[in-house]
């Protein structure tokens, strides 16, 4: 059964035991999966990679049938999944799981994907596509962020930030965090320093990049 990404607040894990999130928009997937988890904080969270499950399917089976006084209710997240996981999902479907919920996190799945088709046709399981964000959505997210943090930026700077995010809110949030760190000491965002800020390498901690690299560059100008 297909539902829209904005409908995740309607998900009831007691009824919808297995959910597929798929798509290229990693930021949206993370956000929506977090929403589901936060609505079920009483459940124990377990994370696996598809390779782990394929190498040892008993990982999932044991979690389904093993009961503990402390973690009867569980949410199992299986990441980086492909069509290879389908047989295990079909096996799980044959068992009536009660206290376990499973979230499947996949990258983009083509229409011919057997995994996607299985979830789309199912009456019991949910399928939530997470398509790339458009410019309008990213602009709203960025504006809301700056408004909440009370950071003043021009429309031109806002456009610059959004344009480099490749239609993915995860990229946007990374850039917004850089800016938040930068202005924490009373520094102002300008056309000149925003280009330096958003082009900093991603393989360092954001705070380290902003506080060290950018600060040094600005002192030289």
Which role fits each region the language model picked out?
Residues 1-220:
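Conserved beta/loop motifs at nucleotide-recognition and modification sites
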């Amino acid at each position: 059964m297909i539902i829209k990404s904005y409908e995740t607040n309607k998900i009831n894990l007691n009824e919808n035991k297995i959910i597929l999130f798929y798509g290229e928009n990693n930021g949206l997937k993370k956000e929506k999966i977090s929403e589901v988890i936060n609505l079920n904080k009483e459940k124990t969270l377990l994370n696996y990679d598809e390779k782990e499950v394929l190498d040892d399917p008993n990982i999932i089976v044991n979690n389904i049938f093993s009961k503990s006084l402390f973690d009867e209710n569980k949410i199992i997240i299986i990441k980086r999944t492909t069509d290879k996981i389908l047989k295990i999902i079909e096996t799980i479907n044959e068992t009536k799981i009660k206290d376990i919920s499973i979230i499947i996190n996949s990258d983009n799945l083509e229409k011919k994907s057997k995994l996607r088709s299985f979830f789309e046709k199912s009456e019991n399981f949910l399928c939530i596509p997470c398509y790339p964000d458009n410019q309008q959505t990213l602009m709203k997210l960025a504006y809301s962020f700056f408004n909440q943090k009370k950071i003043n930026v021009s429309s031109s700077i806002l456009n610059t930030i959004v344009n480099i995010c490749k239609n993915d809110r995860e990229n946007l949030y990374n850039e917004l965090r850089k800016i938040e760190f930068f202005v924490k000491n009373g520094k102002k965002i300008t056309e000149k320093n925003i280009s330096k800020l958003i082009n900093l390498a991603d393989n360092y901690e954001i705070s380290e990049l902003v506080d060290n690299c950018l600060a040094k560059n600005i002192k030289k100008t």
